[in-house]
């Protein structure tokens, strides 16, 4: 299922649809021309045109309001989560960080809000044995230094480097004996992440952050939002990937019933 999700996510991404659509369209045009089938030639032209049209649409900022904002949904509570009850661990999903070999320090990307929020949650609730969990490779050189700078004790950090996705991380955390977590992730990712952690048997206090989709949608609408841009392409690609992931897990849930 892990690799199926990855493949489907790429195929349905704006760049994936453009590449495959244009490739298939070009092959149909070529085959149609060589064997004298005008129908195939026209179908190839149509496929290329549709691919370019979809790429244009999914590269426009206004589309984020329709496919990005709903991901962050009303079910994610917009409140000060510091006031909620304590848990066994703060779970930091991802972190939007990278290690910079040139300058020798961590680099913060668009989702780095997660790291700051995780540190804030840990400092507000740490009682001597509160853990802060991390996953993925390279966090020791990227996320960990920033967490330490923000006041998190290194002894409190627990690593799950083998986890390839959110589902696997949830299972590993549950298997470690942790029962209640404060789950920190981007708002667009929270509904699916919360579902996976609860499915693993964990009690979840959601701590959404990084409301990037809502932030972009709240900006005044401008003419440029109707034209392709790299920023809009990135956000809409993230949105499409998340919708595909939710659909795949929905299918998986239906089959297991």
Q: What are these regions, as identified by a protein language model?
A:
Residues 228-257:
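Structured C-terminal subdomain patch of bacterial secreted/periplasmic proteins
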Residues 34, 69-74, 250-254:
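Transmembrane helix-loop junctions in multipass membrane proteins, especially transporters and channels
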Residues 3-8, 63, 67-71, 240-247:
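Hydrophobic alpha-helical segments of integral membrane proteins
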Residues 1-31:
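Membrane-embedded alpha-helical segments of integral membrane proteins
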Residues 45-61:
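Hydrophobic membrane-insertion alpha-helices, especially the h-region
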Residues 30-43:
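Membrane-interface helix-boundary motifs at transmembrane edges
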Residues 57-233:
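A structural signal for short, hydrophobic/glycine-enriched beta-strand patches
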